[in-house]
Amino acid sequence: MFNELVKKIKSGLEITFEEALALGGLDEDRLNELFLAALQVNRHFHGNRVDLCSIVNARSGRCSEDCAFCAQSGHYRTEAPVYPLLSKEEILERAREMELRGARRFALVTSGRGISESDFEKVLDIYQMLKEKTGLGLCASLGIIGYDKAVRLKEAGVGMYHHNLETCRSYFPHICTTHSFDERVETVKAAKEAGLEVCSGGIIGLGESWRHRVEMAFHLKELGVASVPINILTPVKGTPLWGRPLLEPVEVLRTAAMFRLVLPGALIRLCGGREAALRDLQPLALLAGVNALMVGNYLTTSGRRVEDDLQMVADLKLSVM
């Protein structure tokens, strides 16, 4: 089964929805075959390189949206920090720190449905500074934006825009009611139209089914995104998803491998929640189709030491892009 599937994908043909759906029912004693297939596809399209990105929570809390997983939503009582846009100096310090520690990309992430014009002007100024004073690839995650803002970001030096779908269209209403799935899709399309690469993925462990994950993967394939962040839910006290169990490590790996087979040319990026969900199996993700990591801290939770991730990459005889 997997030999033929790998040959098909390497030749430029695509895995079908039904084939991807069937991976959810694969017996656990055959998961190593799935992981090997994902590794072979990954090596064919990307070699042995791993992309490392980092973020700064540039404006935190008081978001108007009701995303059920989010610590920064103003609809829920959580312990997430609340502060306005960080200063240029604070952001430059964090960017330089992450560059010195091995990150290749750096993103400003701001809470909220979108970004105000006044904050947007400040963000453009910050990106121009980062372009001049660092060698980092610059990414932005500023919520829902249109074509005009995307163009201005590109002109300021941003190369990639991040905006998650979060889940598939059919499950999205269970997760958010204050904006639509289509608004997220339109943001992705606007960024692409402006000439930006797009980083878009979602969160697994929200209560969605395997079919929902496959649907999300095919949505992303249709949109032609360059990078697919996979986050694993870490339930936050005070949110509607508090108390949900963590996904089993093998379920995370199964999902990552499926995304690799559906999106062979994209970066499959393991992000928030990987430490808690995968525990000691994090290296196995890089042998099961994953070829990118978010390093350092996340928005409201701590990551592990960047040095530990770099050692993991080196121990697997992989190289940083």
Swiss-Prot record:
GO molecular function ontology, one term from the record: biotin synthase activity
Cofactor note: Binds 1 [4Fe-4S] cluster. The cluster is coordinated with 3 cysteines and an exchangeable S-adenosyl-L-methionine. Binds 1 [2Fe-2S] cluster. The cluster is coordinated with 3 cysteines and 1 arginine.
Record-listed [4Fe-4S] cluster binding positions: 63, 67, 70
Names of the cofactor(s): [4Fe-4S] cluster; [2Fe-2S] cluster
EC number from the UniProt entry: 2.8.1.6
One Pfam family matching this protein: BATS
Reaction(s) catalysed by this chain's protein: (4R,5S)-dethiobiotin + (sulfur carrier)-SH + 2 reduced [2Fe-2S]-[ferredoxin] + 2 S-adenosyl-L-methionine = (sulfur carrier)-H + biotin + 2 5'-deoxyadenosine + 2 L-methionine + 2 oxidized [2Fe-2S]-[ferredoxin]
UniProt: [2Fe-2S] cluster binding residues: 139, 199, 269
Domain of life: Bacteria
UniProt-listed SMART domains: BATS, Elp3
Boundaries of every Radical SAM core domain copy: 45-274
Record keywords: 2Fe-2S, 4Fe-4S, Biotin biosynthesis, Iron, Iron-sulfur, Metal-binding, S-adenosyl-L-methionine, Transferase
EC class name: transferase
GO aspect biological process, one term: biotin biosynthetic process
Pathway assigned in UniProt: Cofactor biosynthesis; biotin biosynthesis; biotin from 7,8-diaminononanoate: step 2/2
Biological function: Catalyzes the conversion of dethiobiotin (DTB) to biotin by the insertion of a sulfur atom into dethiobiotin via a radical-based mechanism.
PANTHER family the record matches: BIOTIN SYNTHASE (PTHR22976), BIOTIN SYNTHASE, MITOCHONDRIAL (PTHR22976:SF2)
Family (UniProt): Belongs to the radical SAM superfamily. Biotin synthase family.
Subunit (UniProt): Homodimer.
Protein name (Swiss-Prot/TrEMBL): Biotin synthase
Source organism (scientific name): Pelotomaculum thermopropionicum (strain DSM 13744 / JCM 10971 / SI)
Lineage: Bacteria, Bacillati, Bacillota, Clostridia, Eubacteriales
